[in-house]
Structure formats: C-alpha cells, structure tokens
C-alpha cells in the first residue's frame, strides 16, 4: 500500500513538472530577439548592376538609424564606395516587414526571416539573402 502511494506521488510530480515546462516564457519577446539579431551584424549581399559587381552592406543600429553601404568593383580594379544613411523600423511590431526610409525614398523589406547568420527577405520585389559578417 505504501509502495503504491509513493508511486502515485512520483507520477503526480512527474505530470506537474511536465505541465510547467509547457508554459510560455513570459519574458520571451520575439520583437526584441529579432531586433537584437538584426542590429548585431553587418548584413552583406553581392549583386551585379550595370555590369559591375556590387557588394551591399546593411548596418542596422538599435536607435533606428542605419547605413546602406554599396561597394562597386570595376574590372580595372578601381573601387567606388557609396554610403547612404537611412532610418528603419518594424511594421507595428510585426517582425516580418521592415521599413527603410532613405532621404528620397522608402524601401520595404517583406517576409523578413533571420536565423543564425542568414537574413532573407523580399527586397524591392526580389528575394535576397544577406549573410552576416
């Protein structure tokens, strides 16, 4: 009888521990986590524009400011660098849309996905994958 009682107590404790581990973390904030990931790296992509290799580096700061750095590589070996400041913000705390406000235009990054050192999004209508450096 005492043995069965102890077994029931252990089963009850195991069940209660199992239920408590399914509870969501009240301090987990996906907005804060993805913002940290976004601001923790320089995001780099390569593409071709007017026959030139272009390296684009996006830098996001936690204060909502950022830099779009474009480095153009000419066949002659010459390199031109263009740094364009912007302001950025999430779309009403939804972390799948990001607005980048430049001096003369706005760019919307849609379907934003960040995992590890990879940042994928729909950038001006084209799928782009940035790598973190």
Q: Over which residues does each language-model region extend?
A:
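Bacterial N-terminal signal peptides that target proteins for export
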Residues: 1-9
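Bacterial Sec-dependent N-terminal signal peptides
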Residues: 2, 14-42
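Residues marking helix boundaries in flexible regions
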Residues: 8-10, 14, 35, 115
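Tryptophan-anchored aromatic micro-motifs
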Residues: 30-53, 86-92
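Contiguous, well-ordered beta-strand patches that form the walls/edges
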Residues: 51-54, 67-128
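Broad, structure-driven detector of short, well-ordered beta-strand segments within folded domains
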Residues: 56-60
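Short, solvent-exposed mixed-charge patches
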Residues: 131-133
């Amino acid at each position: 009888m005492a043995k069965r009682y102890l077994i029931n107590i252990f089963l009850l404790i195991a069940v209660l521990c199992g239920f408590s581990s399914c509870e969501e973390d009240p301090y987990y904030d996906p907005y804060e986590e993805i913002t940290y990931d976004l601001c923790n790296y320089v995001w780099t992509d390569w593409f071709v524009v007017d026959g030139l290799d272009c390296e684009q580096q996006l830098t996001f700061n936690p204060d909502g400011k950022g830099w779009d750095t474009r480095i153009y590589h000419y066949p002659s070996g010459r390199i031109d660098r263009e740094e364009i400041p912007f302001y950025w913000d999430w779309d009403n705390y939804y972390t799948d849309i990001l607005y980048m406000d430049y001096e003369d235009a706005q760019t919307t990054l849609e379907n934003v996905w960040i995992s590890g050192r990879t940042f994928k999004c729909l950038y001006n209508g084209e799928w782009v994958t940035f790598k973190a450096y």
